[in-house]
């Protein structure tokens, strides 16, 4: 397999891996995860009665992966263009198709935006106030189709993919960080270099959208990197990351946390997503973002075949086909 296609497929598969690994403990505190599974490894079904994913089977993904593949297909079908109107239309179509607006499946910003879009609102107005991580969780495909040498173009594309649900500087900043890391990894950058590219993109992204009171995503990402490099064991690292950076659905916590587990796991998708699943908090989304970045570094071959078989069969996704299509429109 071509190296660039391998990275693109690895990115999409890593995203699904982190999502499915984190699904059972989504929005649980670390203590509850430990009491239920000990150290969580591999795929598990959702615990009976889980407030969000009750009934999900082992290896099943959530809205993180579903929205990312929706965005990927939208970009593919537009020959690499990223247009807010297209993404808004397909976001509503996806939500209707899977019944996403029922129950607690959607994040708060996306749920509000989708209802407004259904009523016919302008997609450039429906993302007002959206500061959670729904833009960052689905953004990896933009990193697959935009090159790191033109961060303004990457930031433009991220903004177009985000504005209908998350039109705030902080949300776009977080999404730019993820897309920037993925984009640089696709070009063969090393881990520190790709993170610097992501941080540079995040700084640009913060200037877009509504300006709200929020901590700096790049600054908190640097804190997460510092914690990841400490000489502690993994349990202690995760506790420090949870306590000092956070693991909630806000962009300012979850995106830096994803960077932290990415660095701690050395860019290995299996190790990175396992760390994310054991962190607590928004484990599926942190795992999806971290897994996408790690997969773009390590490629599809870093994910065991048996693991990939579960992801593709349970969720009816094809990371290789989609990755190949996106590489074909990369610019």
What are these language model-derived features?
Residues 1-331:
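Structured, active/binding-site neighborhoods that engage oxygen-rich ligands
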């Amino acid at each position: 397999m071509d190296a660039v296609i391998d990275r693109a497929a690895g990115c999409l598969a890593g995203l699904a891996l982190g999502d499915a690994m984190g699904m059972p403990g989504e929005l649980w505190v670390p203590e509850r995860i430990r009491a239920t599974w000990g150290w969580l490894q591999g795929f598990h079904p959702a615990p009976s009665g889980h407030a969000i994913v009750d009934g999900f089977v082992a290896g099943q993904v959530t809205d993180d992966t579903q929205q990312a593949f929706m965005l990927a297909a939208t970009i593919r079908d537009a020959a690499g263009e990223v247009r807010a109107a297209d993404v808004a239309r397909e976001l509503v179509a996806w939500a209707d198709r899977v019944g996403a607006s029922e129950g607690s499946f959607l994040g708060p910003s996306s749920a509000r935006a989708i209802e407004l879009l259904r009523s016919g609102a302008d997609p450039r107005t429906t993302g007002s106030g959206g500061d959670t991580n729904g833009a960052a969780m689905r953004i990896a495909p933009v990193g697959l189709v935009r090159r790191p040498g033109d961060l303004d173009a990457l930031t433009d594309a991220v903004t177009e993919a985000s504005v209908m649900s998350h039109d705030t500087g902080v949300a776009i900043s977080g999404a730019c960080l993820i897309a920037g890391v993925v984009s640089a990894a696709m070009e063969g950058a090393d881990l520190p270099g790709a993170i610097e590219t992501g941080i540079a993109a995040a700084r640009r992204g913060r200037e877009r959208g509504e300006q709200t009171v929020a901590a700096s995503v790049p600054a908190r990402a640097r804190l997460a990197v510092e914690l990841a490099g400490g000489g502690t064991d993994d349990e202690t690292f995760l506790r420090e990351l949870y306590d000092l950076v956070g693991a909630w659905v806000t962009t300012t916590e979850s995106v830096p946390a994803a960077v932290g587990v990415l660095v701690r796991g050395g860019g290995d998708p299996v190790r990175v997503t396992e760390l994310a699943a054991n962190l607590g908090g928004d484990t599926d989304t942190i795992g999806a973002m971290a897994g996408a970045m790690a997969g773009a570094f390590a490629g599809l071959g870093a994910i065991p075949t048996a693991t990939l078989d579960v992801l593709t069969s349970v969720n009816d996704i094809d990371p290789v086909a989609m990755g190949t299509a996106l590489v074909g429109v990369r610019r």
